[in-house]
Amino acid sequence: MGVRSAAKEMHERDHNSDSSSLVTSLMKSWRISSASSSKKPSLYKMNTTESTSLPSGYASSADRDRRTSDGNFEAMAKQQASTRRTSNSYSPLRYVNPTLSTASNESPRPALLLRQHHQRHHHHQQPRHSSSGSVGNNCSNSTEPNKKGDRYFKDLDEDWSAVIDDYNMPIPILTNGGFGTPVAPTRTLSRKSTSSSINSISNMGTSAVRNSSSSFTYPQLPQLQKEKTNDSKKTQLEIENERDVQELNSIIQRISKFDNILKDKTIINQQDLRQISWNGIPKIHRPVVWKLLIGYLPVNTKRQEGFLQRKRKEYRDSLKHTFSDQHSRDIPTWHQIEIDIPRTNPHIPLYQFKSVQNSLQRILYLWAIRHPASGYVQGINDLVTPFFETFLTEYLPPSQIDDVEIKDPSTYMVDEQITDLEADTFWCLTKLLEQITDNYIHGQPGILRQVKNLSQLVKRIDADLYNHFQNEHVEFIQFAFRWMNCLLMREFQMGTVIRMWDTYLSETSQEVTSSYSMSSNDIKPPVTPTEPRVASFVTPTKDFQSPTTALSNMTPNNAVEDSGKMRQSSLNEFHVFVCAAFLIKWSDQLMEMDFQETITFLQNPPTKDWTETDIEMLLSEAFIWQSLYKDATSHWL
């Protein structure tokens, strides 16, 4: 009990001393604030003298009161001084050791006093929860924790009061893997080492990265956007003008290439002409080149004029004989043509002129009369229009060629010129239909064979699309018949059709030339009947090979027959690959459609905005498929 009462008495005395110290601190701060600044040293000395004559307990209490009083006064004084410095001008400061503050009559900061007061208060309350033996130990060692706490808060206060005025420090950079260490700074901070800084040397790397993340000023990255060329500053009009200039230069180069082949030549190299025409023919050269590729105009330039006069005269004579009273008119054929002509290209003004309709009607009727095996079939009226429109540009100035579809030929052509135009169109149409006669004879077996070949080709190229058509019960004949009958003319605009025919006639010319070369090689010089005739039906030699079928040997009779079939199916064969490429182009969309949607889509495909570039891509894809499957007979089975 004695120990407990003694502890209680000590606690009450300390508590009373704390209370009295707070009151004394407030009173002294009031007296000091009212006193003059000149008496401050004497007051400090008097308090120091008095503290030495008092007992130890009272001395410690008085010392605490003095520190509290000095702290409050100096805190207010420093606050006013900092305000004046801020308002007047900025003055960089150096790091100052907090231990020297007592020498300059500066006491610790209020935060330190509050911390010490809290520690003292906590120190006197701790014996309630400890034994009597620990009370003595805590009392004897009460000054040591205060010193450690003072050092801790002094370091923090020192950091807060530091002002860095070294502007030559290198800027840290971010390197791969973390922050890079600055290279040997030219100046260092004038900060004195303390015990806390020495203890934190081991954690320097971690603290440097942590502190630098909040104070680093990263250098700006180079502005790559500003280094762009002047192309980005070009307007849309300038870009379009440059594109037009490039296209014009390309056209001029192509025209010069065709001039080198066609001009000032006695014999035109049809092989070179075919190769260069595959990629498109300039408009000013197209009428002559088409006549050469189709086989209507001879390659010997000296014979061309006489040949044209003879063929045009033959056409005039045929018209006179056909429409004379001596010849009875085929009323059903004439009536069918008369119905189909107004429905030919109704969206083009050229074919709505009466003069054009009369010319097309005469051409088609004369062809039907001269080819009774097939007669007139719907679809031939579409095939005649590319020739008619292309040959019509011969009678227009080069600057008006693009207006051919809106001008009435009767306004700039005489009757004789119109007849010559009809004659050239008639003979070229005849040359074209000779290659696809099977498409228009009874039963149209050529078209049925093409549709079958198309289905088998799509089965090899795109099996998923073929299976989808099978699941939806879509038959190729339901949409591909018109593709074969009109050569895709109703699926494209006339301008793109004419471009497509540049390639078609180039492909056709290759087989026709080969056939002609074969027949010319077989021609023997004329002999009299007295000379023995060389047997015609003999087994060919080992080195003999048909130009159109170089991979197999055959008799001359079979060679002629097969070459004729090859010549007639040449255009059909390439056209099948074009149709396959055209169908596969819409494969992704068709896979999502049912039967009705598929038929509707394929009967009216979205090709209204197609350009010559789109047609060239289609023809290139068709050529690739032909190169892969032309000699593979499995896909035709």
UniProtKB/Swiss-Prot annotation:
Residue pairs linked by disulfide bridges in the UniProt entry: none
Keyword Phosphoprotein: yes
Compartments where located: Golgi apparatus, Golgi stack
Single Gene Ontology MF annotation: GTPase activator activity
Residue numbers bearing the Phosphoserine modification: S69, S250
Basic and acidic residues: bias regions: 1-17
Residue numbers spanned by region Disordered: 1-152, 187-233, 543-564
UniProt cross-references to InterPro entries, sorted A to Z: Rab-GAP-TBC_dom, Rab-GAP_TBC_sf
Location of the Rab-GAP TBC domain: 280-508
Pfam families assigned: RabGAP-TBC
Biased composition (Basic residues): 115-127
Bias (Polar residues): 18-27, 46-59, 79-91, 98-107, 208-223
Outcome recorded upon mutating R343 to A/K: Completely abolishes catalytic activity
Keywords, ordered alphabetically: Golgi apparatus, GTPase activation, Phosphoprotein
Keyword presence, Phosphoprotein: yes
Role played: GTPase-activating protein (GAP) that stimulates specifically the intrinsic GTPase activity of Ypt/Rab-type GTPases YPT1 and YPT7. Functions on the Golgi as a negative regulator of YPT1. Functions on the vacuole as a negative regulator of YPT7. It is also active on SEC4 and YPT51. Provides a catalytic arginine (arginine finger) and glutamine (glutamine finger) in trans to accelerate the GTP hydrolysis rate of the substrate GTPase.
Record PANTHER family: LD44506P (PTHR22957:SF26), TBC1 DOMAIN FAMILY MEMBER GTPASE-ACTIVATING PROTEIN (PTHR22957)
Remarks, miscellaneous: Present with 206 molecules/cell in log phase SD medium.
The protein's name in its UniProt record: GTPase-activating protein GYP1
Organism annotation: Saccharomyces cerevisiae (strain ATCC 204508 / S288c) (Baker's yeast)
Gene that produces this protein: GYP1
